[in-house]
Amino acid sequence: MVKRKRYRFRQGDVIDVEEFHDGRYGGPGTGRAKRAKPTEEQMRAVNAQNKAKRCRQRMLEYFREGDIFATWTYEVRNRPPDMQAALKDFQKAMRYVRREFKKRGYEVFWIRNIERGTKGAWHIHLVINEIGDTASIITKAWTKGGTWYH
């Protein structure tokens, strides 16, 4: 038997359906298996799936076609030593972005991911709602390197 969960976004315009087994499937007459404690790898996989689901659902709710997906990169001389420093840089830039959005009468919606590239350079992926001149605002906000749009 398959169970379904339905999530409605954007006042019901978008429906996200999640299907999964109900947990009682198996051969006739067999009971459920005893609960086993998941391994660290299994927990990491489940946590990654849950994080991806939350991100997908937030994007369905808060973002539309035409919103901006950008990457903030660092110049070599400005590279942070760790993720905490990169997070501080992001927070400083977002203070400017929030202030500019507020001046124009808009609320800012964003999702970000800070990661280290294959060659060791930190960068920040950012999805942000478009208000007309969002690109110029986020380019001006980021002073540590380049802003790339996808």
Label every model-predicted segment:
Residues 1-122, 129-150:
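Positively charged, glycine-rich low-complexity segments
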